[in-house]
Amino acid sequence: MNPAEFLSLLHARHCQRAFTDEPVSRDVLEAALLAAGQAPSGKNTQPWRVTVTTGAQRDALSNALCAEYDAGAKPQADYDYSLQPQPEEWMDRARACGYALFELKDIARDDVPARKAHGRENFTFFGAPVHMILHLPAGAERGNFLDAGMFLQNLMLALTALGLGSCPQYSVAGYSDVIRATLGLPANRWIVCGLSIGHPDPTAGVNTFVPDRLPLVDFVDWQQ
């Protein structure tokens, strides 16, 4: 792969929110995970761990999460995702992203059932046949999350290179106790996020959605 092809791969990756039921082979998943494991980490600690679910276990996890969501259970993740209160410019971008996605899916702002169904898709993993759970030791610090983020980005890029789509999901981590109970993970594991993986559905309009990215001038400060 030449430099232009690699840069094109970086630009090509975006969240997929509709998948076919075509299976993903274990060999392909192992290749992607092996590439992800090349991520750097502080003092080579490699703190990340991944639980891969397919088949009946994937379905059991989805069913358990959907049951919590349908019951109106309040999400309670193991860690706070973002700075609070969030800077207004962050909120502006989040709102713009949400509005654009709902417009594409033809979901009106006051259509509560449609919004509820939209949220539920997170827990059906958008139909993906594979769902991975990324976890860290309880009490993990910011640097450990930095390492896990680099691992996750490597993984998503590897999946893209292998012709697969993915969608990272903090929403799933909101029901961390359910995940631990269903997958037999101990209480001393923090759930970082889920990752839905599969072959993107080429007929799904939602998969054309790519949110705007900031221009360099908005996030780079050159100093000489």
What function would you assign to each model-found segment?
Residues 1-224:
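Acidic, surface-exposed loops and disordered segments
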